Amino acid sequence: MSGLIGKKIGMTSIFDENGKNIPCTVIQAGPCVVTQVRTKEVDGYEALQLGFDDKKTVGKAAEGHAKKAGTVAKRKVVEFQGYNEDYKLGDSVTVEHFKEGEFVDIAGTSKGKGFQGVVKRHGFGGVGQATHGQHNRLRAPGSIGAASYPARVFKGMKMAGRMGGERVKIENLRVLKVVADKNLLVIKGCVPGSKNSYVIISK
C-alpha cells in the first residue's frame, strides 16, 4: 500500500453541493522525502522509506542516513510498499499522490485518557439501581470470576486500566479535497490522535 506521512491539523466542517454540512479533518500530508529505496536484490522486498518533518537534535547515525538522500534527519520515518512510480533517493512525494473522491486508510495514536473505570473504558452499565439500599456500586465492575473453581480470573477480563494511547486505524475515509499548494488533505469524518500528532495515510 502506497501512502504518505501527515500531521493532523484539526477538525472543521464544509458544505457539499447539496448544502449538507459535513464534519471533516484537515491533515498536512507531506511533502515527504525518500530517505531509502528498498530493493529485492539487497533487502528481499521492495519499499520506499519516507521521512517527514525535520528533526532538530539528531544522532550521527540518523544524520548520515539522511545525508545519503541529500536531506536532514526526519522526526517520522515510515516504509511504504506498493508504489508504482519510480522514485529515487531524495525525491519528494507530495499530497498530489491522492485524488479527490478516493478512499484512504488512516492510522494514528489515539488520545490517551489515563486510568479509567469499566463504564468509560468498556461501556459497562454499572451495577444495580441507584436506590434500594445500594450506595456505592453505580460504576462498579461487578463479579470478575466464579468460586473455588476455576479459582482464578480468566485472561482478557474487561477491567479498569489505562485507556487510549494505542495505535488505531480507520479504513475507507473519503478524501473531500486536496489543497496541493498548501499540502493539505481534507478527510471526511474524524481521524485518530490529537492535534499535531502524526498519522499515516495509505491507499
UniProtKB/Swiss-Prot annotation:
Record Pfam families = Ribosomal_L3 (PF00297)
Family matches, as InterPro entries:
Ribosomal_uL3, Ribosomal_uL3_bac/org-type, Ribosomal_uL3_CS, Transl_B-barrel_sf
Q: Which Gene3D superfamilies match?
A: 3.30.160.810, Translation factors (2.40.30.10)
Q: Which Gene Ontology biological process is one annotated for this entry?
A: translation
Q: A GO molecular-function term, please?
A: rRNA binding
Q: Does the keyword Oxidoreductase apply?
A: no
Q: Which UniProt keywords apply?
A: Ribonucleoprotein, Ribosomal protein, RNA-binding, rRNA-binding
Record's GO cellular component terms? ribonucleoprotein complex; ribosome
TM region positions: none
Role, per record: One of the primary rRNA binding proteins, it binds directly near the 3'-end of the 23S rRNA, where it nucleates assembly of the 50S subunit.
Entry's family note: Belongs to the universal ribosomal protein uL3 family.
Q: How does it assemble?
A: Part of the 50S ribosomal subunit. Forms a cluster with proteins L14 and L19.
NCBIfam families with a match to the protein in the record: L3_bact
The entry's protein name is: Large ribosomal subunit protein uL3
* Organism of this sequence: Christiangramia forsetii (strain DSM 17595 / CGMCC 1.15422 / KT0803)
What gene, per UniProt, encodes this protein?
rplC
